[in-house]
Amino acid sequence: MQKLKQQVFDANMDLPRYGLVTFTWGNVSAIDRERGLVVIKPSGVAYETMKVDDMVVVDMDGKVVEGRYRPSSDTATHLALYQRYPSLGGVVHTHSTHATAWAQAGMAIPALGTTHADYFFGDIPCTRALSEEEVQGEYELNTGKVIIETLGEVEPLHTPGIVVYQHGPFAWGKDAHDAVHNAVVMEEVARMAWIARGINPALNPIDDYLMNKHFMRKHGPNAYYGQK
């Protein structure tokens, strides 16, 4: 588990490095599928003082099996996503400014250009509002459930992120590093969409043929972007 703890620590430290978090407003996790264990950031521990050994290991029921701190308060959301989507290896939650602004506005982040299409196949969806009962009950678990409800049958690695209504963004990937990479991209395309819509409020979404080309050349069965 030490290698996975190091990966999760490094991914968490990338959040302030890329300007995605203020204070302790974020968390990254990763899963060991063979052992059924998840490594996640401890709750409320400052990035400036956090160490590798502060990472918390939990089982799939959220029980701490290793670590001296309580795990992130969002642990149940992470676990719900891992349980539903076997392809996920890492999950990240932040309150990055522009992605959170779309969440607070209750709007999907529109696919307006090729930067977006290189990573997200279509709009980045926004969930519905959680009911009072869902918030007063198992809030973090219900946050995971509403993400799953919103994604439906979408392949999660084709839409590697979402904004939770009035809350903020969650992103995921093949591992913790990939999840953070997608969170960084989500924040950038959220900012670009805000600027573009400000310049031209009547702007149309990216054409399907252009979106398909950009996404598939990086992620499709015959992808040719980058080096093998």
Curated annotation (Swiss-Prot):
Its cofactor is Zn(2+). The keyword Isomerase applies. Zn(2+) binds at residues 74, 93, 95, 167. It holds the Pfam family Aldolase_II. It catalyses: L-ribulose 5-phosphate = D-xylulose 5-phosphate. GO terms for molecular function: aldehyde-lyase activity; L-ribulose-phosphate 4-epimerase activity; zinc ion binding. The active site is at 118 (proton donor/acceptor), 225 (proton donor/acceptor). Substrate binds at residues 26-27, 43-44, 72-73. Binds 1 zinc ion per subunit. Induction: Induced by L-ascorbate. Repressed by UlaR. The keyword Transmembrane does not apply. It comes from the Bacteria. Its EC number is 5.1.3.4. GO terms for biological process: L-ascorbic acid catabolic process; pentose catabolic process. Keywords: Carbohydrate metabolism, Isomerase, Metal-binding, Zinc. One of its GO terms (cellular component) is cytosol. It is an enzyme of class 5 (isomerase). Pathway: Cofactor degradation; L-ascorbate degradation; D-xylulose 5-phosphate from L-ascorbate: step 4/4. PANTHER family: FUCULOSE PHOSPHATE ALDOLASE, L-RIBULOSE-5-PHOSPHATE 4-EPIMERASE ULAF. Catalyzes the isomerization of L-ribulose 5-phosphate to D-xylulose 5-phosphate. Is involved in the anaerobic L-ascorbate utilization. HAMAP family: UlaF. Belongs to the aldolase class II family. AraD/FucA subfamily. This is L-ribulose-5-phosphate 4-epimerase UlaF. It comes from Salmonella typhimurium (strain LT2 / SGSC1412 / ATCC 700720). The gene is ulaF.
